UniProtKB/Swiss-Prot annotation:
This is Telomerase RNA component interacting RNase. Residues 80-90 have a biased composition (Pro residues). The keyword RNA-binding applies. Keywords: Acetylation, Exonuclease, Hydrolase, Nuclease, RNA-binding. Exoribonuclease that is part of the telomerase RNA 3' end processing complex and which has the ability to cleave all four unpaired RNA nucleotides from the 5' end or 3' end with higher efficiency for purine bases. Residues 1-12, 64-79 have a biased composition (Basic and acidic residues). Residues 1-119 are annotated as: Disordered. GO terms for molecular function: 3'-5' exonuclease activity; 5'-3' exonuclease activity; RNA binding. The gene is Trir. Its EC number is 3.1.13.-. It comes from Mus musculus. The modification N6-acetyllysine is found at residue 143. The lineage of its organism: Eukaryota, Metazoa, Chordata, Craniata, Vertebrata.
Length: 173
């Protein structure tokens, strides 16, 4: 068990002994430098994985990226597209005795999948709904100031709630 106040060293690295200089081996060996003892241990799969940035912050990455993309586009253009390519047969071979040649192209048959049939007769008519006529109160409230709007709303609710004579409200479900 390590003494209190000391950092635990990772496996493969030893804590400095009494004969050591008092500094840890980590402080002496930075990323990319070899340990003091001279043995060529590499802790990791590659020395590049030490977390050091390979690109300088001078805009060179963008240039490299653009060059790489241009090269890929050139390669795509040079390569033929994947898929079966059939050479067009000569017209005389296509019009042989077993193959009558079509003159009209794809033909008059069209797919009706997903299409409306029947033209405009079956389509719903939209935008023809008659507008609701405004009542006199609504016309007054639209023109008037805030107080007139408030009073019109109060009148509307009083008409629905109760009469002044019997002070009863109609049943509400």
């Amino acid at each position: 068990m390590a003494a209190r106040g000391r950092r635990a060293e990772p496996p493969g690295r030893e804590a400095p002994g009494p004969a050591g200089s008092g500094r840890s081996r980590w402080a002496e060996s930075g990323p990319g430098t070899s340990p003091e003892s001279g043995d060529d241990e590499v802790s990791g799969s590659s020395p590049v994985s030490s977390g050091v940035n390979l690109f300088a912050n001078d805009g060179s990455f963008l240039e490299l990226f653009k060059r790489k993309m241009e090269e890929e586009q050139r390669q795509r253009q040079e390569e033929p597209p994947p898929g079966p390519q059939r050479p067009d047969p000569p017209a005389s071979a296509a019009a042989g005795p077993g193959n009558p040649k079509r003159k009209g192209g794809p033909g008059p048959t069209l797919s009706f999948v997903g299409k409306r049939r029947g033209g405009n007769k079956l389509a719903l008519k939209t935008g023809i709904v008659a507008k609701k006529q405004k009542t006199e109160d609504e016309v007054l409230t639209s023109k008037g100031d805030a107080w007139a709007k408030y009073m019109a709303e109060v009148k509307k609710y009083k008409a629905h709630q109760c009469g002044d004579d019997d002070k009863t409200r109609p049943l509400v479900k």
